[in-house]
Structures are given as C-alpha cells and as structure tokens.
Curated annotation (Swiss-Prot):
Keywords: Cytoplasm, Endoplasmic reticulum, Hydrolase, Lipid metabolism, Membrane, Transmembrane, Transmembrane helix. It comes from the Eukaryota. GO terms for biological process: ether lipid metabolic process. This is Lysoplasmalogenase TMEM86B. Homodimer. Residues 41-46, 94-99, 141-146, 189-199 are extracellular. Competitively inhibited by lysophosphatidic acid.
Length: 226
C-alpha cells in the first residue's frame, strides 16, 4: 500500500445519484419477480392477473416521478407508461384486444413525441422499413380481416417509434428494439404460429424495454437531488 495514501477516504463505489436511482427502481424489479413467480395462467382472465401484470409498468411511473425534477420528456414517458398499463390490462381479456391495441398505439405516439425528430437519420428509417415489410407481409396473410386495418395502423406507429428510438440511441434505442421484438413475437404467436415459450419471451422483452426507455431520463440534467 502506498503510505502516502493511507488515511485518505476511499472513493465510494456508487455515487449518491446512482443509489437514489437504484432505490426507486427496486419496486420495478420486485413486481417483475412477483409476476414471473406467480405466473398466473393467461387463459384465466381476472383483475388480480391484470393488476400483477400492470404493477411493474406502474412502478416505473413512480420511478420517473421520484428521480426526475420535471420536464416534458419525463412527463411524456409517464403518459406512455400509463397508456401501456391500460393496454396490459385490456389484453388480459380477449374481447378487449382492440382496446389494448389502441392504448399501446397511444403509448407509442407519446414515445414518439418524447423522442423527437432530431437527429433525423433517414437511413435508419430505411432499415426499419426493409426489416418490417417482409415480416408484416407474412403476418398479413394470417390476420382476421376485421383486424387488418387496426393492426396495420399499430404497426406503423410501432415501426416509427423504433426508428426514433434507434435514432436517439443509448438505452432508448435498446428499449425500442426490445419493445418491437416483444410485439412481433406476440403477434406471430397469436395469429401465425404458436411459438415455444412465447409468453416468457414477450413479457421479458417487454418489461426490459420499458425500464430501458425509462432509464433514458437519466441523460437529462433535471434529475432530482438525492
């Protein structure tokens, strides 16, 4: 040991801000664990199942309110999360499927508003279109006629959100990518072909997407002091 450094205070492993963020994220991880441990069958719709499913996303609203000192970006993310929670609850009941699609479409529009159009990066848009067209072209053959219009509109909102998330980069980009993976897996499993462990893939990527997008608020200078 360097004798000249004896007695000097050690640099903390985590900053106070990181500990503050971690503290307010802990309810998200706890409620995610509850969801996966309970694993309530999705063929038995109930308000308990809906609540357990929504709690991780609602906990992220609390997280954003706790760590952000205010601003339009955080407010739009909170709005998107609340719309997502409504969508989560609706999708528990098959008869409310279109209501769930509408709620998630509203969430994507709020994410789009939050992400903005700068930098534009049209090349990324071209890549998203080239990836989306073959997938949706195949899925289209399996969709019930009465859902084609609604799911086409939803797919456009999702693809645009992916483009803007990737353009923003960082945790936002990863979150947008995982959100898209979650939704495309869900749609293929529901309408085209049953996939092994589809629900696990859908919910793991979905919760990961929401927390990654929420963490993008840490790039803002308006974080609340601890």
């Amino acid at each position: 040991m360097d004798p000249g450094k004896e007695g000097l205070p050690r640099k903390p492993r985590f900053s106070a801000q990181q500990l503050h963020v971690g503290k307010w994220l802990s309810p998200f991880f706890f409620t995610c664990a509850v969801y996966f441990l309970l694993w309530i069958p999705d063929d038995q719709p109930s308000w308990v199942g809906a609540l357990v499913k929504c709690l991780p996303v609602l906990s992220l609203v609390v997280f954003l309110r706790a760590v952000d000192a205010g601003g339009g970006y955080s407010a739009r993310l909170q709005g998107a999360l609340l719309c997502s929670a409504v969508g989560d609850a609706c999708l528990v009941w098959p008869e409310a499927f279109l209501h769930g699609v509408a709620a998630f479409a509203a969430a994507h529009l709020l994410y789009l508003w939050a992400f903005g159009l700068t930098p534009l990066q049209p090349g990324l848009l071209l890549l998203v279109i080239l990836a989306a067209l073959p997938y949706y072209g195949l899925l289209l053959w399996h969709l019930p006629p009465d859902l084609v219009l609604a799911l086409t509109a939803y797919s456009l909102a999702l693809a645009t959100m992916l483009w803007r998330g990737l353009a923003r980069g960082g945790s936002t980009g990863w979150g947008a990518l995982l959100f898209t993976l979650s939704d495309t897996t869900l749609a293929w499993n529901a309408f085209a072909q049953p996939l092994p462990h589809a629900r696990l893939v859908v919910m793991t990527t979905y919760y990961s997407a929401q927390v990654l997008i929420s963490l993008s608020v840490s790039q803002s200078p308006k974080l609340k002091p601890n």
